Amino acid sequence: MVDIVDKALRMGEGHQLKKLENVAKAVNALEDEISALSDEDLKAQTPKFKQEIENGKSLDEIMPEAFATVREVSKRTLGQRHFDVQLMGGAALHWGNIAEMKTGEGKTLVATLPTYLNALEGKGVHVVTVNDYLASYQSELMGRIYRFLGMNVGCIITEQKPPERRKQYNADITYGTNNEFGFDYLRDNMAWEKADLVQRGHHYAIVDEVDSILIDEARTPLIISGPAEGDVTRWYRQFAKLVLKLTRDEDYDVDEKKKVVGILDPGITKVEDFLGIDNLYEPANTALIGYLNNAIKAKELFLRDKDYVVTQGEVLIVDEHTGRILPGRRYNEGLHQAIEAKEGVEVKAENQTFATITLQNYFRMYDKLAGMTGTAETEAAEFMNTYKLGVLPIKTNKPMIRKDQDDLIYRTKKEKLAAIVKDVAKRHAEGQPVLLGTASVESSEVVSALLDVAKIPHQVLNAKQHEKEAAVVAVAGRKGAVTVATNMAGRGTDIMLGGNVEFLADAKLKSEGYSPEDTPEEYEKRWPGTLNEIKAQVKDEHEEVKELGGLYVLGTERHESRRIDNQLRGRSGRQGDPGESRFYLSLEDDLMRLFNTQLVAQVMARGMEEGQPIEAKSVTKGVRTAQKAVESRNYEIRKNVLKYDDVMNKQRTVIYSERQAVLKGEDIHKDILRFISDTVESYIKGANKGSEKPKDWDWEGLFKALNTVIPTKVDEDEVRKIVGGLKGAKAVEAVRDLIVEDARQQYGEMEETIGETGLRDLERRVVLAVLDRKWREHLYEMDYLKDGIGLRGMGQRDPLVEYQREGYQMYNSMIEAIKEETVQLLFHIDIKQVATTDDAVDEVEETAESADTIAVASGPDENGESVVEAAEGEVEEEDEDTDAKQAIAESAAASEAGESTLPVAGPAPVSHAEGKVPVSKRPKSEELKTPWADGRTFPGTGKNAPCPCGSGRKYKMCHGQNEA
């Protein structure tokens, strides 16, 4: 099916390429004219273009002259002239496409063309890279073009504070990583002051390594989280010890392909004995199952130096696609804590989601989106379906002459590694540079150790040595160089035969104390001479390495994705240089073992001798089949993630839009008055019990409940007399009007006390505080709903439709709760005892439980989803030798005493359903922990209805637990 879609997408490709060629011709026709301009005349082009846009000219009309201007400035500042194919790539990006350009074709330089053109509109252009280093490096190097033309260039990096970030976003052009852009969007929608906002819209973005960011990381929601209530870290330590006593295939099952585990009956018995409980599956022990599953996953599915590394007592995730460490990222739902417990490092507290968005929905917010990569064609259908992005392959400037050899397959990893070392030794002796690509940190260290034994000098580049990444890659093409690296996707620095001229020139100038930030004039002055000096040094070695066959890329195993393999291969053969590539495989490699058992069986049937490889087209084809199976599975996961996030995205868009309006000073006084009226009416309907006759209403309950929200001065007996002869809607309306009139009078007195401006500011703060808390609670409830929604399929119901329906109901309940709690807070602040408006605001903000956390997204779990947890503050160390049975006993004793120390699934959601007893005034957080400990039940209450005890929790999450 995907292949058919791919063919359909390619039907108009010839016409598109013709348009791109015409742009290149138009730019070339202007070259002599633009080249004749002085520096001052070139600088004057920018204000001229801006004026033309103001006068009504389109960017398309300006494009040829703007591109010609950028090309000329590039020649004068960088010594680089855009090739025709680069001009074509620039036009493709301007028109909102993905330009597929092979490695070494100068994608970074290509981006300067549409970036400058679109920045002329003054709305900001975002250039998205895969890491902070590339963002800084590209903004420095390419920034020389923009600054020459009078453009401001900004760069967003992790350590920056909000004022600095705002300055960078206000620049004409801003470089940064996908995570930084996404998290700044989320943080802007958590801000309490207009002055705290940093972004200024989403006009145009160019995404470098677009397949890595929009495909590989699309399964990864960006999530900002903060500490949840309660400390359950000891349970992770206990279960880390417990699973060491369990045996795989005897006590539990593991499915490595799907990344899931399952506890078996013998294992259940051992767990119950260890914990001293009768039944693991009793409702009171539900949370223990989660700790057990995570502990088994941490033991069996997440391996040190492959999926993560441990550095300075911290578990750091390794990006499966690039081999880079992902600082700040944490697996979700307790998995990261389970890994920390397994490794014996500090177990950090569990977190609660405050804000979240997928990369897919973040980048779909841009008015115009474009991307660059060397490997997008295999995912063309997904780019079009998800992002409405076409993929346009741009031909290489010079013909590709790299030799891609067929794969060699061995029986065992040991045989494969021996053959690899032998091959590398031969080529190193000849002086040919070699790049060995590995799939994990562990593999790179094994290969490095074998090269050490063989006395082959080499450099290692993996997640543990990422600081020296650019320096290592820049010299990987020199004569005799041997470089061992984890996945090369997105490394960003070209491997040039003889060495990377620009990098070496930049490094030389910086070593002499000159940089584009601190000494821009001296740096620019010395750049041409230094560049020519380095070029002369590199030229002879470049020719020598070409004679030796160019860069030899050796893949030590196939990756799940064909694109990652193609990116590794693409490091060789740039700009018409010679090169060669080959992959070495074994039947023990994960891809072969998990996804192509049929091929493994066929190879084994041949009766291979030890050390004897098979080299055949059928092997390469079989590997490709396995990769397609994995890619298809991952695509389905990404589609599923997007379908569910689209439900949240509609809600998030409305909530964030309303929040921004409040934050930016929109007058919400009329909204507050409406909230008062709606809340009062909701309470009246909840008290009438469906009866049209006021005499049957629960008047005592109505006024008791109402007074927890609005301390009304209306007399109950007087109201009953007035509405005595009315029925139905008229009775409801009459009662509502009486109470609302009284509430408005009280509210007017409040305004007289603190002034109109003071009350408007207070209203804004209260709405922000309540909206933020209710939105967080809603996110938790939606996660809870999604976790179990798949089971609806067993009842012949579409889980997605059910999620949409119930999510809509929960959203409406949240809106009602926001109205009610806003009114409640405003009427319960003692204005007379508040000296200033700021004091009142402080009182409100204390209820907001706001957090200032910076987090980034993590790799996918078995469902293809992941989150980020970034806990704020210190975590107290607990005694790791606490006996589990003692802990269970303590919990039971505490429960009898009216307390609870057993773990719970997470922070309890708070909601309000119309027509039920409304939420009472919110208790302090310590009172919320165990309201059901008194043992009461309320027969007849719906599981999802608010608990009648007034805690604000759903009944099933509160006193409903006592019915079990």
UniProtKB/Swiss-Prot annotation:
Pfam families linked: P-loop_SecA, SEC-C, SecA_DEAD, SecA_PP_bind, SecA_SW
Domain of life: Bacteria
Binding residue positions for ATP: Q86, G104, E105, G106, K107, T108, D494
The reaction(s) this protein catalyses: ATP + H2O + cellular proteinSide 1 = ADP + phosphate + cellular proteinSide 2
Keywords for this protein: ATP-binding, Cell membrane, Cytoplasm, Membrane, Metal-binding, Nucleotide-binding, Protein transport, Translocase, Translocation, Transport, Zinc
SMART domains named in the record: SecA_DEAD, SecA_PP_bind
Disulfide bonds: none
Cofactor note: May bind 1 zinc ion per subunit.
Membrane topology reported for the UniProt record: Peripheral membrane protein
GO MF assignments: ATP binding; metal ion binding; protein-exporting ATPase activity
Residue stretches of biased makeup (Acidic residues): 871-882
Chain segments carrying region Disordered: 846-964
Cofactors: Zn(2+)
Biased composition regions of type Low complexity, renumbered to the chain: 887-900
Binding positions (Zn(2+)): C947, C949, C958, H959
Assembly behavior: Monomer and homodimer. Part of the essential Sec protein translocation apparatus which comprises SecA, SecYEG and auxiliary proteins SecDF. Other proteins may also be involved.
Function: Part of the Sec protein translocase complex. Interacts with the SecYEG preprotein conducting channel. Has a central role in coupling the hydrolysis of ATP to the transfer of proteins into and across the cell membrane, serving as an ATP-driven molecular motor driving the stepwise translocation of polypeptide chains across the membrane.
Protein name per its UniProtKB record: Protein translocase subunit SecA
